[in-house]
Amino acid sequence: FELRDYQKEAVDGLYNYWAGKAGDNPLIVAPTGSGKTAIIAQIIKDAMSYPGTRVLVVTHVKELLEQGANGLLALYPEADFGIYSAGLGQKVLDRPITFAGIQSVWERAFDIVPAPDLVLIDEAHLLPKNTETRYNRFIADLKTCNPMVKVVGLTATPYRLDSGYLHKGNGAIFDGIAHDIPVAMLMEQGYLSPVISKGGLNQIDLTNVKKRGGEFVESDLATAASDPELVRKTVEEIVDLSADRKSWLVFSSGVNHAYMLKDEFETHDIDVGVVTGSDSSAVREKTIADFKSGELKCLINVNVLTTGFDHPAVDSISLCRATASCGLYIQMIGRGTRVAEGKTDCLVLDFGANVERHGFIDQVKPKDKSAGSSEGEAPVRQCEVCQTMCHAACKICPECGFEFPAPLLNHSSSSYRGAMLSS
């Protein structure tokens, strides 16, 4: 297989990081849809050129393990690998390459003989901040077995969903960023779908929604989002603005809210499904399969499809929830950035002021708590005529031609091709 230029740069960036002795355990930041599987496959193939090398690929759910193993096999058919996952019914630890679920393997570090030389952690943003986690204990045990082991994290966002950077703070597993693939470049070169954004005319009132641990309290958010009139108007707006789009993905503010949205969509004769964390695997997989096949036009999810969900045809995303997590924000938007035949862009309808809160997807950064408590303003403004999200410096709306009055700092609801990029 042959890497794209930016994928090769990511792999080279890793080796340069090690050569420059910047550290042993870096992150590679690869936006959703950039071909992370190919990057992982190349790193593994390079490692296998050194006889006796052992590579371990670790992630948190069996679906990602299957995707990773199948992806490696497709790109590198001669790879000699095994899978260690209770969920997949396989427990093989004696191959040069092992794909393992952290829940299954975290207490088995001393059983991996010889010890791994390289550990690749997929979806690294899901690592908790707490240092007493399965990942930390597992890696500490691996280092006992092989003090020279290197650990590389791959992620679309170099920060956790609930806190700051993965390579900063006490007990951080990672020590830096080896390479960060720019999302704007991928969109400009056609490797990712452009994303356009409209701020919903009907926003969730967050006045009485408290924060806990840096995120909105789920019960408060669910209550605020579940106002019947707000639900009715929100769905009406989604149906209107997504009318010419094929595959709609909706992020809700809770299970009850999801089913309220579903009932409302059905009054518009929209074929819609709901997936939640409490669904059985069989039910969830069937609903997702129906969505991917086109049997369902709309899929509403409750904290389920924010990572590892791959359906390139998604061309409409509705954020019917608010999040203070820039990582979660990027992961949600990322569900629509993959390219697909007949897809020109992905529309993001924001009903939770998330774009205002976090800004453009190529400039999102977690808040630096040490710099003070002020959250500041994201550099976006919304056209009051068509609701397009524009850069704060725009004087004329690129969608409808509305001339902005004196400088504004916030946003409104129509869209243009570059609405979610800073330039």
What is each of the regions a protein language model found here?
Residues 83-93, 259-263, 270-302:
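Conserved helicase ATPase core of P-loop NTP-dependent helicases/translocases
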Residues 21-43, 251, 275:
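Walker A/P-loop
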Residues 175-252:
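Conserved interdomain linker/interface between the two RecA-like ATPase lobes of SF2 helicase motors
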Residues 129-197:
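Post-DEXD/H (motif II) to motif III coupling segment of the RecA-like Helicase ATP-binding lobe
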Residues 103-106, 277-365, 370-371:
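Conserved RecA-like P-loop NTPase helicase motor core
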Residues 63-85:
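Conserved helix-turn-beta segment of the N-terminal RecA-like "Helicase ATP-binding" lobe
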Residues 1-29:
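Conserved pre-motif I regulatory segment
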Residues 87-118, 129:
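Conserved helix/coil segment N-terminal to the catalytic DExD/H
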